[in-house]
């Protein structure tokens, strides 16, 4: 049996190193994406809580036909919910960027740019 040429062994070793590096990078990116997805879920729960609180606080005013209080509560909660929705939109942009990076792990820079 002939010995394996050094060039073949070097190529094999480089391939293993490249694969390990790509796996580590993919793991890093996926963990960042998972963190952002958890943050989105948390903010969505904040929205749900704000809407539930709104219902509890507004119901008595609606029973008493106090439209000014109802309107004020609505304005306050809408502002809060809009802020949460902006946070979610920003996190979703980051998630989309991470998805693109994950898809491009291991691709040549020229191929990834296309």
How would you describe each model-predicted region?
Residues 8-32, 67:
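Short, charge-rich amphipathic alpha-helices with coiled-coil/heptad character
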Residues 14, 41, 45-48, 75-89:
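Generic structural signal for well-ordered, non-transmembrane alpha-helical segments
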Residues 25-46, 82:
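Short, charge/polar-rich alpha-helical segments
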Residues 27, 61-65, 102:
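Secondary-structure edge/capping motif, primarily at the C-terminal ends of alpha-helices
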Residues 33-36, 77, 91, 95-98:
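Long, non-membrane, amphipathic alpha-helices that form coiled-coils
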Residues 40-57, 93:
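Amphipathic, heptad-repeat alpha-helices with coiled-coil/zipper character that mediate oligomerization
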Residues 51-78:
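Short E/K-rich amphipathic alpha-helical oligomerization segments
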Residues 87, 91-114:
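Long amphipathic alpha-helical coiled-coil segments
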């Amino acid at each position: 049996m002939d010995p394996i040429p050094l060039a073949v062994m070097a190529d094999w070793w480089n391939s293993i190193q490249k694969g390990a590096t790509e796996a580590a990078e993919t793991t890093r990116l996926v963990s960042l994406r998972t963190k952002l997805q958890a943050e989105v879920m948390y903010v969505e729960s904040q929205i749900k809580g704000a809407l539930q609180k709104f219902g509890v606080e507004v119901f008595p005013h609606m029973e008493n036909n106090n439209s000014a209080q109802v309107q004020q509560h609505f304005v306050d909660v809408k502002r809060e919910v809009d802020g949460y929705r902006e946070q979610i939109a920003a996190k979703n942009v980051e998630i989309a960027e991470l998805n693109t990076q994950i898809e491009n792990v291991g691709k040549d820079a020229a191929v990834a740019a296309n």
